[in-house]
Amino acid sequence: IIGGSSKYFKFKENIFHKLYEEILFLSNKYMINVIPSRRTPLAFIERLKKMDLKNIYIFEDQFNPVEYGNLLSEAEVQIVTWDSISMISEAISSGAKTLIFPFEENSCPKRYKNFYDRIIEENFISIYNRNLQAPTPDLNKYNSELKSKILNKIESNLSFKLNES
């Protein structure tokens, strides 16, 4: 999943060059689904199309949530540029191994770094590596813990409300 320029990240040409190199490298061994975001420059997508590689599928309909969801759910591994917490969260929620592709580290906001540190610590993701080594997230455990927290919060608010009356 490839993002694009934002308030924090400029996505300069050297970043796209690195992405091309990695896509080319991985396509020699794996089928690659390239999912650009609405912020991904058209020139990058067009350049990928011109490469005409047999193991690359470029998802072009960003307004088709069904196909987007299918691509996420069918993949064994997700590689996501780290410029969007939402894209990373969607990749993790697919249950596949997720790797984030860092760049422009100096312009990365502290809250983003805190998010990355937390999800790495929780074994949800790894930093991109060519071996595609990453943990498989245990979403059942996470969802169970989240459910307990939500129910406890609701319960504590209910008892507070009942005591007020």
Regions found by a protein language model. Name each.
Residues K49-S86:
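Donor nucleotide-activated moiety binding/catalytic core segment of transferases
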Residues S86-T136:
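Catalytic binding pocket for nucleotide-activated donors in carbohydrate/polymer assembly enzymes
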Residues K29-Y30, A75, G95:
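Short, well-ordered alpha-helix to beta-strand connector turns
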Residues Y116-S165:
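Leloir-type glycosyltransferase catalytic cores
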Residues S6-K7, R38-L42, Q62-V66, I85-M87:
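Short, catalytically relevant binding-site loops at active-site mouths
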Residues R39-D52:
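Short, structured helix-loop element that forms part of the nucleotide-activated donor/catalytic region
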